[in-house]
């Protein structure tokens, strides 16, 4: 079983960008924790990060061919990217939306996700633990 983990815009800056909101953990550290859990679960993961909406759409399309599920942090695209929403809807595999921060306790424009209604699940506000829960959920939904 393979799960694709997609990190959206600005997540490459984790550890430096607003640590009071996102914590001090880096993207590399998140990916390492995910790899450790994947080993325990007996699943393969492929982690990708992009600041480009179009590239994320392409990666979601690729996931439909190469993976059994997706863990997806769309970053700021969460709030307005109908292209990503349509891609999640179209791929036909379990997709868990995840956010480090609680988007519902932040600025008004961040309190709405256009992705959540078409995702299999939505986890936010739990920091790195949210990613680990999302990986467990994706694996369970994909059938392990």
Swiss-Prot record:
Q: Which UniProt keywords are given for this protein, alphabetically ordered?
A: Amino-acid biosynthesis, Aromatic amino acid biosynthesis, Lyase
- The transmembrane segments are none
Q: What is its EC number?
A: 4.2.1.10
Recorded GO terms, molecular function? Answer: 3-dehydroquinate dehydratase activity
**Listed PROSITE patterns:** DEHYDROQUINASE_II (PS01029)
Task: Name the reaction it catalyses.
Answer: 3-dehydroquinate = 3-dehydroshikimate + H2O
Pfam families, per the entry: DHquinase_II (PF01220)
The entry's substrate-binding residues are 73, 79, 86, 100-101, 110
Q: Does the keyword Amino-acid biosynthesis apply?
A: yes
Tell me the first and last residues of the signal peptide: none
**Pathway where this protein functions:** Metabolic intermediate biosynthesis; chorismate biosynthesis; chorismate from D-erythrose 4-phosphate and phosphoenolpyruvate: step 3/7
| UniProt entry tagged with the keyword Lyase | yes
Active-site residues annotated for this sequence: 22 (proton acceptor), 99 (proton donor)
GO BP, sorted A to Z: amino acid biosynthetic process; aromatic amino acid family biosynthetic process; chorismate biosynthetic process; quinate catabolic process
Question: Site feature Transition state stabilizer: at which residues?
Answer: 17
Q: What does this protein do?
A: Catalyzes a trans-dehydration via an enolate intermediate.
UniProt protein name: 3-dehydroquinate dehydratase
The species is: Pelotomaculum thermopropionicum (strain DSM 13744 / JCM 10971 / SI)
